[in-house]
Amino acid sequence: MLPRDELSAILTAATTFVCPSVYEPLGIVNLEAMACGAAVVGTATGGIPEVVDDGVTGRLVPIEQLQDGTGTPVDPERYVADLASVLTEVTSDPEQARAYGAAGRERARDEFSWDAIADTTRALYAELTA
């Protein structure tokens, strides 16, 4: 595992970050990439769509999965082709990738930073105890 400062430097230098997970409860790794300003290409599964706003902070790759709990694609070749297509789309348009990265950084800060989480938690507690 890389030290945090090295990982941050790599993600900050990256134009695009790819997360081809077939199972991801939330996808902290995507938030880390977004916080560093990288456009994210991730699988539309689990919690990834709650982090990556398709067409705003990056792109989501569609996936049809077996219903056995493994996350295995029904058609692995189709999933790989879709992943390659979306990745090519993002990396072929550096201006759009930068826009995704900037929007992702803003979303990570505004919605997922510790300050944002604390504000949301305080507001919820205030509402529940009012």
Each PLM stretch: what is its role?
Residues 15, 37:
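A short alpha->beta transition loop at the rim of the catalytic pocket in nucleotide-sugar-dependent
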Residues 27-30, 48:
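Short glycine/serine-rich donor-binding loops of glycosyltransferases
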Residues 55-77, 89:
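A short acidic/histidine/glycine-rich donor-binding loop in glycosyltransferase catalytic cores
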Residues 9-14:
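Short alpha-helical donor nucleotide-sugar binding micro-motif in glycosyltransferases
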Residues 82, 89, 96-111:
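A short, well-ordered alpha-helix in the C-terminal region of glycosyltransferases
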Residues 22:
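Aromatic "clamp/platform" in nucleotide-sugar-dependent glycosyltransferases that forms part
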Residues 89, 110, 114-130:
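C-terminal alpha-helical cap of glycosyltransferases
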Residues 39-42, 52, 59:
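Short hydrophobic beta-strand element within catalytic cores of glycosyltransferases
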